[in-house]
Amino acid sequence: MNDVVLSCKNVSKKYTEFKTDIAILKDVNLEIKKGEKVAILGLSGSGKTTLLNVLGGLDKCSAGEVYLMGERFDNQSVNKRAKMRNKHLGFIYQLHHLLPEFTAIENVMIPLAITKKYTKKESIKLANEILKKVGLDHRADHKPAELSGGERQRVAIARALVTNPNCILADEPTGNLDSQRSESIFALMQQLSDDFGISFVIVTHDEKLASRMNKIYRLVDGELELVINSN
């Protein structure tokens, strides 16, 4: 059985500026298996976020191929990519991007509304269950302004998890948190990955936290290098 959730083959990405091609990604190959926890390290501007966006179907590669759950992903129509993305992927960002006028539970329910598969009652039940998993069911009716930075990021994690994705792509998920809260968020993501068999691809500048992952890659001048493989 093929347990590869997300992969890219010979992916390159370039932009043209003032008639000059600027290479952001160069012939990148990456394979993410079920339940695997992968960290991608790199300096600011190294292309980490671009790679995450290409893997998540939010940006198109200039060359190469991206596969999601064994199906070619990068060459699909915008609508088909969106459907595949909503079904199989979750996203966590450095800034939580919670809607300020919505409560924690309402923010978590948003991806369920997009799928149009659940009644409101079912959505509330699912959102409550996942908030409990991240230890925030007692804060379900609080708006983001009433939550701490760590709590807001936990809500963002719950929102990413609520549709039961196969893989979560996280871009500097602890970048705005202090070291203690960063440790707590990383431990939570590891536990959720172990409990649900969800793959995590985490872009981070924090080498200490990255060391907890199964694999560590480093992106240097657009080229991806495997640093550690503890599988």
Swiss-Prot record:
What keywords is this UniProt entry annotated with? ATP-binding, Cell inner membrane, Cell membrane, Membrane, Nucleotide-binding, Translocase, Transport
Molecular function, one GO term:
ATP hydrolysis activity
Q: Could you say which residues bind ATP here?
A: G42, L43, S44, G45, S46, G47, K48, T49
Output the PROSITE patterns linked to this UniProt entry.
ABC_TRANSPORTER_1, ABC_TRANSPORTER_2, LOLD
Output the SUPFAM superfamilies linked to this UniProt entry: P-loop containing nucleoside triphosphate hydrolases
Q: Pfam families of this UniProt entry? A: ABC_tran
A GO BP term, please?
Answer: protein localization to outer membrane
Cell membrane: is it a keyword of this entry?
yes
Q: Where in the cell is it found?
A: Cell inner membrane
GO cellular component terms attached to this protein's record: plasma membrane
- Tell me which EC number(s) this protein carries: 7.6.2.-
Residue stretches spanning the membrane: none
Q: How does it sit in the membrane?
A: Peripheral membrane protein
Domain (ABC transporter) ranges: 6-230
In which family does this protein belong, per the annotation? Belongs to the ABC transporter superfamily. Lipoprotein translocase (TC 3.A.1.125) family.
Summarizing the function annotation, the protein's role is: Part of the ABC transporter complex LolCDE involved in the translocation of mature outer membrane-directed lipoproteins, from the inner membrane to the periplasmic chaperone, LolA. Responsible for the formation of the LolA-lipoprotein complex in an ATP-dependent manner.
Subunit architecture: The complex is composed of two ATP-binding proteins (LolD) and two transmembrane proteins (LolC and LolE).
Q: What is the protein named?
A: Lipoprotein-releasing system ATP-binding protein LolD
UniProt lists the gene as lolD
